[in-house]
Amino acid sequence: RPSFLGGSIYDELKGRNKFNYTVRLIEDLGYKEVMSKTGSKTLFVAPDAAYEEFFKNNKWGVSSYEQLTDAQKRILFNGAQLNNAYVIEMMGNADNGDKNLALRQNSAAAVVDSVRWWSPEELPTNYSQVEGEKHYWDRFKGEKGKSILMATDDSEPMMTHFIENNMKEQRVRRSDVAFIVGDKNGWNESDPTRAYVFGNRVMEQDVVCLNGYFHVLDKVLVPPSSMAEEIRSNGETNIFSHILDRFSAPYYDATLTENYKALHN
């Protein structure tokens, strides 16, 4: 075996002894066999030190690994995984072969990963006093202590990335990329090349394994939610969120329901 080729993704992460939280995600979600065998996978991982910082401050309010729900574990793991083997440089290529034109890739995440129980207090309110206008959420709010299973976004989850060659193709400056992703340290033209996934910087790339690659990030990758959910939950756009809530309603999705049952049975 060539010297540059490591073991499987699982074995390589476990052997380095600084990705223990990622290893726990793999084991808890039943992916040990998948990540131990040959195949085509790409995984973005954060070191244990990054997880310790994550548990100090995060949007879920969890302070330890043990407090993560199964849904949150799936978001962290599947949202950082691609069902193909990619070195960083190749991630900017489109499916049709065009180079440096892709800004996003389909992740291994699924809508069912984000399904969770919502309490009556968490559900939207149809703010309207117009006569005859329906308040679709009221029937769920009337029963105190009742919760419903729901996903807030039915679109296919994707991973957004900023690759150097991709940015050059679109004539986007490094300083612009740093501003977009919120890198307070900036990115000067004289600095070495970089890559970002959402707002996370790739610190070590293209670790070659028997069944794909993994890339090391500076922070724990938490895929952002939909635009409507970000507006609802960021604390600074509550009034605008109430306007959107007026026109919102719960919809039954038979396919999603069956997928959820299959996942939990």
Annotate each predicted stretch with a short phrase.
Residues R1-N265:
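Mature, structured domains of secreted/extracytosolic soluble proteins
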